[in-house]
UniProtKB/Swiss-Prot annotation:
Enzyme class: transferase
Organism field: Deinococcus radiodurans (strain ATCC 13939 / DSM 20539 / JCM 16871 / CCUG 27074 / LMG 4051 / NBRC 15346 / NCIMB 9279 / VKM B-1422 / R1)
Chain positions recorded as 1-deoxy-D-xylulose 5-phosphate binding sites: 162, 188-189, 210-211
The protein's name in its UniProt record: Thiazole synthase
Catalytic residue positions: 101 (schiff-base intermediate with dxp)
Main location class: cytoplasm
UniProt-listed Enzyme Commission number(s): 2.8.1.10
Upper classification of the organism: Bacteria, Thermotogati, Deinococcota, Deinococci, Deinococcales
Length: 267
């Protein structure tokens, strides 16, 4: 891998293009091993008011080596822009980190993000000095609007959170990628390493994965597999794919081929 091919977000550069979530692991030890196997440098954690005081949540931040990872608090569970802004400020006060994965999700069934609320919250939070990474549906117009208000990335979903269905709308994700002036991080719904490779092949700058690794039979092995998928996809994108054709094209030239005479047919 070209060590000069870095992912730059909010003025910071990273050699890994795989971001990881920290939820759904059976214990902290498995989570730590998976993070290590993935090579990730950015990890996201849900920080809500109730979780900061709830038994079982204590220790998550202690389990993360914050000298090794860029912490990315998120507003998972927030249903309105106003709630997301409040939780973002709480997260910054609790962690000292201004990076934020912005999630505004009013829909409890399909967990699809609210574009209007996300844009409104993003504008407020950027003005408050946050480095905002908004989670959105794949919409090129919305992506440009989020970029215009100062978001550090745009994070279009591949498919609904936790479904593992992969890239269901690659054409729409391409509209987000095309013309983007900030990194595009495909998030949610990736199920297998080939999904990550496909996202990077399309031109996405990175992917964020959680459930596909945490719920794998062997999370550590799956974390490594996703790292390889991301690397393969990025290399394939940089190498430039062949032109697609409607008709077949032989890989070996026909010129110079020795042709035998047709066998005689008995009378």
């Amino acid at each position: 891998m070209n060590t000069n091919d870095l992912l730059t977000i909010g003025g910071q550069s990273f050699s890994s293009r795989l971001l990881l979530g920290t939820g759904k692991y059976r214990d902290f030890a498995v989570m730590q091993d998976a993070l290590g196997a993935s090579g990730t440098q950015i990890v996201t954690v849900a920080i809500r008011r109730v979780e900061l005081k709830a038994p079982g949540h204590d220790g998550l931040l202690d389990a993360l080596d914050l000298d090794r990872f860029q912490l990315l608090p998120n507003t998972a569970g927030c249903r309105t822009a106003e709630e997301a802004v409040r939780v973002a400020k709480l997260a910054r006060a609790a962690t000292g980190v201004s990076w934020l994965k912005l999630e505004v999700i009013p829909d409890p069934k399909y967990l699809l993000p609210d574009p209007i609320g996300t844009l409104r919250a993003a504008e407020i939070l950027v003005g408050e000095g946050f480095t905002v990474l908004p989670y959105v549906q794949p919409d090129g117009v919305l992506a440009r609007a989020l970029e215009a208000v100062g978001c550090a990335t745009v994070m279009p979903l591949a498919s609904p959170i936790g479904t593992g269905k992969g890239l269901r709308t690659p054409e729409l994700i391409r509209t987000v990628i095309d013309g983007a002036g900030v990194p595009i991080v495909v998030d949610a719904g990736l199920g297998v390493p080939s999904d990550a490779a496909q996202a990077l092949e399309l031109g996405a700058d990175a992917v964020l994965v959680n459930t596909a690794i945490a719920e794998a039979r062997d999370p550590v092995a799956m974390a490594r597999a996703f790292a390889l998928g991301v690397e393969a996809g990025r290399l394939g994108y940089l190498a430039g794919r062949m032109q697609q054709r409607d008709s077949a094209s032989p890989s070996s030239p026909a010129a110079g081929v020795v042709r035998l005479p047709d066998p005689e047919v008995p009378a």
